[in-house]
């Protein structure tokens, strides 16, 4: 069965930057947030949180289809914070984390509103994504990479994790 590697974390932790580097190194990647918008895999746009409310059923069906039809020798890399695939489709999950200071700065640079910044900072403090991934996939398939360091160093650590999983 074909599987995916998830690159996840609170918005602003570096998922897309790292996934783009993986793509440049030959890994097939999907930016899940972009896919949701382009293929309208959402219920509606929430003005308060300034985000799309994802239709999980539609998204999972589409992601499973993409995983099953992946023709690469590598597993599909899924970049996003809304991915909760059935465990049998997930090879490994890399959760990117960063300090609150860095997160606030990165989200401010994206021109996020204060409410959205606060919501994401709270999610990072409460370890919501890490907790969800551990519950879904178990500690043997989840690892954490700190992204407060340079992009190059973060990418190097993620690449080590990906290669470790591929060699198992």
Regions found by a protein language model. Give the residues of each.
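Pre-Walker A (Motif I) flank of P-loop NTPase domains
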Residues: 1-4
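P-loop (Walker A) phosphate-binding loop of NTP-binding proteins
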Residues: 10, 22
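Walker A/P-loop
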Residues: 16
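A glycine- and Lys/Arg-enriched "phosphate-lid" helix/loop adjacent to the NTP-binding pocket
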Residues: 44, 97-144
């Amino acid at each position: 069965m074909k599987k995916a590697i998830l690159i996840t974390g609170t918005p602003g932790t570096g998922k897309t930057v790292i996934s783009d580097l993986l793509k440049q190194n030959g890994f097939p990647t999907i930016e899940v947030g972009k896919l949701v918008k382009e293929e309208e895999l959402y219920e509606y746009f929430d003005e308060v949180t300034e985000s799309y409310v994802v239709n999980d059923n539609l998204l999972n069906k589409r992601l499973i289809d993409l995983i099953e039809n992946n023709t690469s020798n590598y597993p599909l890399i899924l970049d996003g914070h809304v991915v909760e695939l059935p465990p049998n489709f997930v090879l490994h999950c890399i959760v990117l984390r960063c300090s609150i200071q860095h997160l606030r700065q990165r989200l401010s640079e994206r021109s996020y509103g204060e409410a959205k910044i606060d919501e994401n900072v709270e999610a990072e403090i409460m370890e919501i994504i890490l907790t969800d991934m551990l519950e879904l996939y178990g500690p043997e398939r989840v690892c954490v990479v700190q992204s407060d360091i340079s992009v190059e160093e973060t990418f190097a650590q993620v690449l080590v994790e990906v290669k470790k999983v591929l060699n198992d």
